[in-house]
Amino acid sequence: MVVLVDTVSSTPVRPRHPEKAARPDALSPKKPDWIRVRAPTTRGYGETRSIVKENGLVTVCEEAGCPNIGECWDKKHATFMIMGDTCTRACAFCNVKTGMPGALDPNEPAYVAEATRKLGLEHLVITSVDRDDLADGGAAHFAATIRAVREACPTTTIEILTPDFLRKDGALEVVVAAKPDVFNHNLETVPSRYLSVRPGARYFHSIRLLQRVKELDPTLFTKSGIMVGLGEERHEVLQVMDDLRSAEVDFLTIGQYLQPTRKHHAVMRYVTPDEFGGYAKTAYAKGFLMVSASPMTRSSHHAGDDFAKLRAARAALAR
């Protein structure tokens, strides 16, 4: 279980997810020495949190209980989660709450743009909850947010981490037309684990979505990630790599799954740093331009630095 101690806020911890309350506790093995969580105590963390709250924004850093929040917020790096804090799905790994979301805030794109300006972000990551209740899955809102940031901060590069827009015809085209710099959509786990880990999604739909992004705009960088430690086998991880490369995905992230609460999916195994290194080496050999694989790797961790490396890798390949 990941425990983050917020020494800045006195806000009580949110109760356990009501939709998971009837589940038996899932016990995970003790965390090994290589799993370390930095407590968020710095001035930079406090300043970032103030800007987020002043603009009435939600971050995936907080909602998902990200273990890297102390490091990232100290550097004034935050990943904004648009369209509310309530998801229409109930994935077994995710700490974001589930329920019926409220109406979209039409001012949210402007608030995100203003927070981006105040934080001085050179690279912005925008993600969202799943909004299966909306006709377009929130695609137009994503596009509006990208455009608002472009107008307010024209030099800021933009990375988006989207839901799968399952059964939302035309939604992907709307988002791609807004021209983010990086389009990220995470597979989260191997196909055999979808029923227990990500039951509301479809593995090959996600692969096709990433492939379609490249068809719509070959200049966009595409990115995807998975968690390990959920019961997958090594050969399954390698097959995911092959599937992503068949969709011409540029950037792969692999990180250790950490259990948010005992009502979430248990950690089946802690993958060693050496194994992560092996995955990275294999992924590069399969043709990915950029790979980040480590116990604490998360989609948005070091996203700005990684984007610079990704762009340099493409430029080197074109020479």
UniProtKB/Swiss-Prot annotation:
A single GO cellular-component term on record: cytoplasm
Positions annotated to bind [4Fe-4S] cluster 2: C87, C91, C94
Segments of skewed composition (Basic and acidic residues): 16-28
Residue segments, region Disordered: 1-28
Entry's localization field: Cytoplasm
Domain spans labelled Radical SAM core: 73-289
EC code: 2.8.1.8
Disulfide bridge positions per record: none
GO terms for MF: 4 iron, 4 sulfur cluster binding; lipoate synthase activity; metal ion binding
Alphabetized Gene3D superfamilies for the sequence: Aldolase class I (3.20.20.70)
Keyword field contains Nuclease: no
InterPro entries (UniProt xref): Aldolase_TIM, Elp3/MiaA/NifB-like_rSAM, Lipoyl_synth, rSAM
Name of the protein in its database record: Lipoyl synthase
Source organism: Rhodopseudomonas palustris (strain HaA2)
